[in-house]
């Protein structure tokens, strides 16, 4: 687990180099919040993931959306926003409160909310008139289905400690993917199709 965390943190740190600006400092503040949220998720570890191997599940993380050219420029920002919103929704529940250290959980929810608030300040600059179309964007539907699968899994498992541990590890993967997407947005100044 320590090796995996080190690898994830290294990937996140690599993405912190100087990048473009969307006029709202997306690359700086958002990336710092993302790094802190990953650290908090790591600190929330209460069980060894090895003790929960029987509960493992492939949630079908839609990584292909941030790899290669599958995600269009006008879809990247809403996908990032949706991933963070769904992450917040997952941890801001009564079931989550019962499973985790309250202080760490509150810090994580605050960090996710800060990322969302920051994205809200950038949304108009990046999206313009596209906001009304967000519900119909296929990648957004894919993200929603992914998180619905996580909610369904937790319910199936009775919100057990092992189920939450599996979800915690999965959320580290998801937030790492969202960090990769943030990196692409900032590196290209919001234009995913630029060289």
Swiss-Prot record:
Single Gene Ontology MF annotation: hormone activity
GO biological process, one term: female pregnancy
SMART domains: IFabd (SM00076)
Subcellular location(s) per record: Secreted
Tissue: Constitutively and exclusively expressed in the mononuclear cells of the extraembryonic trophectoderm.
Superkingdom of this protein's organism: Eukaryota
Summary of the function given for this chain in its UniProt record: Paracrine hormone primarily responsible for maternal recognition of pregnancy. Interacts with endometrial receptors, probably type I interferon receptors, and blocks estrogen receptor expression, preventing the estrogen-induced increase in oxytocin receptor expression in the endometrium. This results in the suppression of the pulsatile endometrial release of the luteolytic hormone prostaglandin F2-alpha, hindering the regression of the corpus luteum (luteolysis) and therefore a return to ovarian cyclicity.
PANTHER family: INTERFERON OMEGA-1, TYPE I INTERFERON
Further comment: IFN-tau genes are intronless. They evolved from IFN-omega genes in the ruminantia suborder and have continued to duplicate independently in different lineages of the ruminantia. They code for proteins very similar in sequence but with different biological potency and pattern of expression.
Family named by the database record: Belongs to the alpha/beta interferon family. IFN-alphaII subfamily.
Stated name of the protein: Interferon tau-5
Source species: Ovis aries
């Amino acid at each position: 687990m320590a090796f995996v965390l080190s690898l994830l943190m290294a990937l996140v740190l690599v993405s912190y180099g100087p990048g473009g600006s969307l006029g709202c400092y997306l690359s700086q503040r958002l990336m710092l919040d993302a790094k802190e949220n990953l650290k908090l998720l790591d600190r929330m570890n209460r069980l060894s993931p090895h003790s929960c191997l029987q509960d493992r599940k492939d949630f079908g993380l839609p990584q292909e959306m941030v790899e290669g050219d599958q995600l269009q420029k006008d879809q990247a920002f809403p996908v990032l926003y949706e991933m963070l919103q769904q992450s917040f929704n997952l941890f801001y529940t009564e079931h989550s409160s019962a499973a985790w250290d309250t202080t760490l959980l509150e810090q994580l929810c605050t960090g996710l909310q800060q990322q969302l608030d920051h994205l809200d300040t950038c949304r108009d600059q990046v999206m313009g008139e596209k906001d009304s179309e967000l519900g119909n964007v296929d990648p957004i539907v894919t993200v929603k289905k992914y998180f619905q699968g996580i909610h369904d899994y937790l319910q199936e498992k009775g919100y057990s400690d092992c189920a939450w541990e599996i979800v915690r590890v999965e959320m580290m993967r998801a937030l790492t993917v969202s960090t990769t997407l943030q990196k692409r947005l900032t590196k290209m100044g919001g234009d995913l199709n630029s060289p």
